[in-house]
UniProtKB/Swiss-Prot annotation:
Reactions accelerated catalytically: (R)-pantothenate + ATP = (R)-4'-phosphopantothenate + ADP + H(+)
CC annotations in GO: cytoplasm
InterPro entries, per database record: P-loop_NTPase, PanK, PRK/URK
Binding site for ATP: G91, S92, V93, A94, V95, G96, K97, S98
Protein name: Pantothenate kinase
Length: 306
């Protein structure tokens, strides 16, 4: 961490867990296991020591947002419609964004029992493979230019305006957008938007996705740790694909393991690492909170914007 983080306060896990005294985890180990991504590592202690204080912090931000909205309505002398509290979550491929997103969704729903908590990933706003192939961009999938940013920003604007909005659905099994399938959102109380690109701005220099966020999180780790997690996940995906001929990864299951690992390392170096170093990691200081993971996937440090 460099002077890039001069606007953040560094908090150790030991200090962070003392900021919230509730000891009940709000979910069972079985529920936690069911929402944990392939090859991620999280347990009930992580929920109690890291995520319950985080839920409490999000509540602080939500109350502040509601107070500001109310004060604005008084100033403008008009009613302001209740709008979703939007949380953006970013980080590298294989760093554990999906686990964090699903866990926050569950914990927020358990904490705010009458609230609706929705989750959407920016994968759905990738251009379909057919479009990427047509424009000779398939090898740039995941890079900023492979996303339909106009569609994504329009979605966020519609949701933030309290209107019903729809998002395309992406499948990692087929490695493509699912044809004729949409995910619909009708003014939820909370919306979590997760993706590698949520702090990026590719096309319109005057508008960032983060302009719509009320809170934002970056999941951080050393790149050599993320590479190891990526390779482990790739091998696990190959195991699953052996029993599913329709799975995108089936085409790689016939490779000897050493060749499969060599292929995955090449993909990591030429695509994922380049994307991380050039486009993802440089945006992390736009987050309100950075959760740093150690080699064992455990969060060891927290950085909160001052």
């Amino acid at each position: 961490m460099s002077n890039e983080f001069i606007t953040f306060e560094k908090i150790s896990r030991k200090s962070w867990k003392q900021l919230h005294q509730k000891s009940k985890p709000l979910l069972t180990q079985e529920e936690l296991t069911s929402i944990t991504s392939l090859n991620d590592n999280i347990d009930i202690n992580d929920v109690v020591e890291v995520y319950l204080p985080l839920i409490h912090l999000i509540q602080v931000y939500k109350i502040a947002q509601e107070n500001l909205s109310f004060s604005k309505s008084l100033f403008l002398k008009k009613d302001i419609q209740q709008r979703p509290f939007i949380i953006g979550i970013s980080g590298s491929v294989a760093v554990g964004k999906s686990t964090t997103s699903r866990l926050l969704q569950l914990l927020l729903a358990r904490t705010h029992k009458t609230s609706t908590v929705e989750l959407v990933t920016t994968d759905g706003f990738l251009y379909p493979n057919s479009t990427l192939i047509k424009n000779n961009m398939l090898n740039r999938k995941g890079f900023p230019e492979s996303y339909n940013m106009e569609l994504l920003l329009n979605f966020l604007d519609t949701v933030k305006g309290g209107q019903t909005a729809s998002a395309p659905v992406y499948s990692h099994e087929i490695y493509d957008i699912v044809p004729d399938q949409q995910q619909t959102f009708t003014n939820p109380d909370f919306l979590i938007i997760e993706g590698i690109n949520v702090f990026q701005n590719q096309q319109n220099n005057r508008l960032y996705m983060s302009d719509y966020f009320d809170f934002s999180i970056y999941i951080d780790a050393d790149s050599h740790h993320i590479e190891q997690w990526y390779l482990e996940r790739f091998l696990s995906l190959l195991e699953l694909a052996k029993h599913d001929p329709a799975n995108y990864y089936t085409r790689y299951t016939s490779l000897p393991q050493n060749e499969a690992i060599a292929f995955a390392k090449k993909v990591w170096k030429t695509i994922n690492l380049e994307n991380l170093e050039k486009f993802i990691e440089p945006t992390r200081n736009r987050a309100e909170l950075i959760l740093h993971k150690a080699a064992d996937h455990k969060i060891d440090e927290i950085y909160l914007k001052k």
